[in-house]
């Protein structure tokens, strides 16, 4: 699977480990930065670029990482067509995909040990959208609103 990833300085070290982990698992990972550690960098450009790539490449998924994951999720959700979910447990990671068809996952590097973060990302990537009518209806309502305010 093609996976787009973006982070700032707070998630840089974890991102490097996530990229290696995913490539070892056979995923095609596109790293949208940060490419070097810079304590003064800003997360929006990296996260927006990764999120836009997910929209531009249907079937791909995205990962954004920061200190808490909150701002990174918000930045990714600025991109039309993105449904980014901040996850903190196996259940939230799986439900983001199963019920909400989330296409970007946000993880807080300062909130989880490396093993926990990798498990959250794996759970997100391996869980398909259920396709249940009620979940699709809710997603369609969000898409309709998104289109109406951007028109």
Regions found by a protein language model. Give the residues of each.
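C-terminal binding/interaction regions
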Residues: 2-6, 10-11, 90-151
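Glycine-rich phosphate/diphosphate-binding loop of Rossmann-like nucleotide-binding domains
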Residues: 5-24
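Short helix-loop-beta junction
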Residues: 20-29, 81
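A short beta-strand-loop structural module common to alpha/beta enzyme folds
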Residues: 28-39
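N-terminal entry motif of extracellular EGF-like repeats
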Residues: 42
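Helix-adjacent hinge/juxtasegments
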Residues: 46-87
């Amino acid at each position: 699977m093609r996976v787009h990833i973006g982070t700032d300085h707070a998630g840089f070290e974890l991102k490097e480990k996530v990229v290696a982990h995913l490539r070892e698992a056979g995923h095609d990972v596109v790293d949208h930065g940060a490419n070097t550690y810079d304590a003064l960098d800003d997360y929006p450009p990296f996260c927006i670029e990764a999120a836009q790539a997910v929209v531009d490449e249907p079937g791909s998924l995205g990962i954004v990482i920061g200190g808490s994951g909150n701002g990174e999720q918000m930045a990714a959700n600025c991109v039309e067509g993105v449904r980014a979910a901040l996850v903190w447990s196996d259940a939230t990671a799986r439900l983001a995909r199963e019920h909400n068809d989330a296409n970007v996952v946000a993880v807080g590097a300062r909130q989880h040990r490396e093993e926990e973060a990798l498990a959250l990302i794996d759970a997100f990537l391996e869980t398909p959208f259920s396709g249940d009518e009620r979940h699709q209806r809710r997603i369609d309502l969000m898409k309709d609103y998104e289109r109406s305010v951007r028109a």
